[in-house]
Regions:
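Flexible "cap/lid" subdomain of the alpha/beta-hydrolase fold that forms the substrate-access gate
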Residues: 1-114, 122, 131-136
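Histidine-centered divalent metal-coordination motifs
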Residues: 119
Length: 138
C-alpha cells in the first residue's frame, strides 16, 4: 500500500497536500461537496505542519502490527463491554464491515450503517452520528 511505504509518500505529497489530500476530501464522502472548502483548507493547513504527514502515513504503516495484535487478542478473549461500530453506506464508508470486524473482538457489538455517508462521518452526517452516540453512551 502506498501509504505504508517508508518516506515515499511524504516525498511525493509534501508541497502538494492540496492535490493529494484534497482529492480524498472530495472523493471519499458520499457527495463531493460534503466537506466545506473552509474545512478542507484547515485540514490542509494542519497537514502542512512539520511531522504531520509522517504521522498520518504512519497510521497506515502500523496496520500490519495492529492486525497481528488484534488477532492475538481475539484468540484469547473478547471485550465484554458494549462496543459501537458505524460505517457509511457509500464511498469507502465500509457499511456493515465495521460492525462485522468488531464482532471478532467484542461480545456486544452495536451499530450499523449510516445512510448517505462515506468515509468522513462526523463531517458528512454529524446529526445522525451525534444521535447514535447519545443513544449508545446514554
Amino acid at each position: 500500500m502506498f501509504h505504508q511505504t517508508l518516506d515515499l509518500p511524504e516525498a511525493l505529497v509534501t508541497g502538494r497536500e492540496d492535490i493529494y489530500l484534497g482529492w480524498f476530501y472530495r472523493t471519499y464522502p458520499a457527495r463531493p461537496d460534503a466537506i466545506p472548502e473552509a474545512d478542507i483548507a484547515e485540514y490542509l493547513r494542519v497537514y502542512r505542519q512539520p511531522g504531520a504527514l509522517r504521522a498520518g502515513f504512519s497510521y497506515y504503516r502500523a496496520l500490519p502490527q495492529d492486525i497481528a495484535d488484534n488477532a492475538a487478542l481475539a484468540a484469547r478473549f473478547k471485550l465484554p463491554m458494549p462496543v459501537l461500530g458505524l460505517g457509511g453506506d457509500r464511498s469507502w464508508g465500509r457499511g456493515m464491515e465495521v460492525v462485522e470486524s468488531l464482532r471478532r473482538l467484542a461480545v456486544d457489538v452495536q451499530g450499523g450503517v449510516v445512510e448517505n455517508c462515506g468515509h468522513f462521518m462526523p463531517e458528512e452526517q454529524p446529526e445522525d452520528l451525534l444521535r447514535r452516540l447519545i443513544a449508545f453512551l446514554g
